[in-house]
């Protein structure tokens, strides 16, 4: 009976993870295609749309790297003992995750600089040079990426030494847990940046509402609505990102447990929810993407009815 319940839970988690992968890939490919088509039609593209497109592409690559690692661990776990395979999987995961997180952070910076209202001269300069601010942010992220790659190389070398010396599986898993813990540490930097943008947006909204109370203006003006929409997008990103970081930390702390157990699959399902859920939020929160998604849904409904009419 216990075995049956365990099997049902295992299949349920695998199904959830599979659906998350499918929805995540379709959602991010959709975001990228909409922006590419719009770019081709107009002959130009805004910096924000470029960030959306880059984020969607990096998220798609990240999900594909997760699928690859998941299939390798499921179908042939022995490959994880090979230095080349470990290096390939870890670096591909780390690079795609790095850019997907940093591009999302750049979106938070764009929202903050576009929506927030401060009279500070430094803020006004940053607001005017928003593109340069994002460019500098990406350059800094590349420096952090290089540092992360150095750590990854040391990790794979150590793992190879353990394999050659026939070290126990627990030692290998401890090294992998250390890798996850360190990688999580590197992802905390963009999280701190996004959290700062969120807090500054709240402060900007509070000041704006305070000024409106003094001037006896209505509470739902354009600036207030923009603040609220920006906060909704950023806070959703932070919540999903927090769940993602916690899943990585939990997996690194529970790494001595067999990696195919229910807890591991549950943590992976939480991790995959980050790139999947955030892409859905971006589609719903962006007017162009939302309109394009409605057009696709209407087209699919029309095709479905057309097929039904031709049926027997």
Swiss-Prot record:
Keyword list, A-Z? G-protein coupled receptor, Glycoprotein, Membrane, Receptor, Sensory transduction, Taste, Transducer, Transmembrane, Transmembrane helix
Q: What is this protein for, i.e. what is its function?
A: Gustducin-coupled receptor implicated in the perception of bitter compounds in the oral cavity and the gastrointestinal tract. Signals through PLCB2 and the calcium-regulated cation channel TRPM5.
Example GO CC term: the record gives: membrane
Q: In which tissues is it expressed?
A: Expressed in subsets of taste receptor cells of the tongue and palate epithelium and exclusively in gustducin-positive cells. Expressed in 15% taste bud cells in circumvallate and foliate papillae but only in 2% in fungiform papillae.
Annotated S-S bridges? none
Regarding protein family, the annotation reads: Belongs to the G-protein coupled receptor T2R family.
Topological domains annotated Extracellular: 1-6, 83-92, 154-185, 251-264
> Which residues point to the Cytoplasmic side?
28-61, 114-132, 207-229, 286-312
Q: Indicate where this protein is primarily found.
A: membrane
What does the UniProt entry say about where the protein is found? Membrane
| Transmembrane feature ranges | 7-27, 62-82, 93-113, 133-153, 186-206, 230-250, 265-285
The remark listed among the other comments is:
Several bitter taste receptors are expressed in a single taste receptor cell.
Instruction: Give the membrane topology.
Output: Multi-pass membrane protein
Its Gene Ontology molecular function terms? bitter taste receptor activity; G protein-coupled receptor activity
Task: Show the SUPFAM superfamilies listed in the entry.
Answer: Family A G protein-coupled receptor-like
Glycan-modified residues: 166
Query: What Pfam families would the database entry show?
Result: TAS2R
The protein's name in its UniProt record: Taste receptor type 2 member 103
